Design a protein with these regions (language model features):
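N-terminal "domain-start" segment that seeds a small globular fold
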Residues: 2-36, 57-58
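Short, surface-exposed beta-strand/loop micro-motifs that present aromatic residues
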Residues: 35-37, 134-135
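Short active-site neighborhood of thiol/selenol oxidoreductases, capturing the structured segment around
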Residues: 38-61, 77
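Loop/turn elements at helix/coil->beta-strand transitions in domains of secreted/extracellular proteins
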Residues: 42-44, 73-76, 132, 141
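Structural microenvironment flanking redox-active thiols in thiol-disulfide oxidoreductases
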Residues: 55-105
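Short, internal strand/loop/helix patches
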Residues: 78-80, 94-130
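Thiol-/selenol-based redox modules, centered on thioredoxin-like
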Residues: 123, 131-167
C-alpha cells in the first residue's frame, strides 16, 4: 500500500523515526564544500539520498517531477550520493568520474557527494537497506524532518509534501 511508504517525522514517539536530519559534510560536483542540511536555510530542503550508481535514474525521475511541478521555486532540491568512506585517492577518482558524466553546472551544484560510514548514516535515519533512494523534506531552520519517503516521488507524494510544509 502506498500509504505505508510515508512516515511523518512528527509521528508519535515509538515509531523509531529520527526527527532531525544529521549534519553531513561533502562537496558538490563544482568542488564547493557543503554541510547538509545546515547550509540550506533560505527554503525548506528536499534531499534525495542515493546509495547505488543505478539509483541515478530514480533520482533523475524524482527531480524531473519536482521541477515540472515548480517545487524548485519553493524548495531547495539536492541529491546526495552516499558513499562508504574510502581512501582520498578513491574519492578524487569517483568525484572526477561524476564530474565528467555531469556537465550541467546546475546539476553539479545540487549534487553533494558525502563519504562517510554508510551504515552509521543509514542507522541514524532508520534506513534498513540501500536498495532504493530515500527522500526527506527538511525544515529550513530547524533541520527537522517534516516528511520522508522511499522510492521515486509520485504525484501523491507532491500533495503530501505541500500539505506537510503549508504550516
Amino acid at each position: 500500500m502506498v500509504e505505508e511508504r510515508f512516515v511523518n517525522a512528527a509521528a508519535p514517539a515509538g515509531k523509531g523515526m529520527p526527527v532531525v536530519f544529521p549534519s553531513v559534510q561533502g562537496k558538490n560536483l563544482n568542488k564547493v564544500s557543503k554541510t547538509v542540511p545546515d547550509d540550506f536555510t533560505t527554503q525548506h530542503l528536499i534531499a534525495i539520498v542515493a546509495f547505488q550508481q543505478w539509483h541515478q535514474r530514480n533520482v533523475d525521475q524524482t527531480i524531473e517531477l519536482l521541477e515540472k511541478n515548480a517545487f524548485g521555486e519553493q524548495f531547495e532540491i539536492i541529491e546526495i550520493p552516499v558513499i562508504q568512506k574510502a581512501t582520498r585517492f578513491r574519492q578524487i577518482r569517483l568525484d572526477a568520474l561524476m564530474r565528467a558524466a555531469i556537465r550541467d553546472h546546475r546539476i553539479r551544484n545540487r549534487t553533494i557527494t558525502v563519504y562517510l560510514d554508510k551504515n552509521e548514516f543509514m542507522t541514524s535515519l532508520d534506513i534498513e537497506d540501500d536498495a532504493s533512494i530515500h527522500w526527506f523534506v527538511i525544515h529550513r531552520s530547524a533541520n527537522t524532518i517534516l516528511l520522508r519517503g522511499e522510492g521515486v516521488i509520485t504525484p501523491k507524494d507532491l500533495e503530501r509534501i505541500t500539505t506537510a510544509t503549508d504550516s
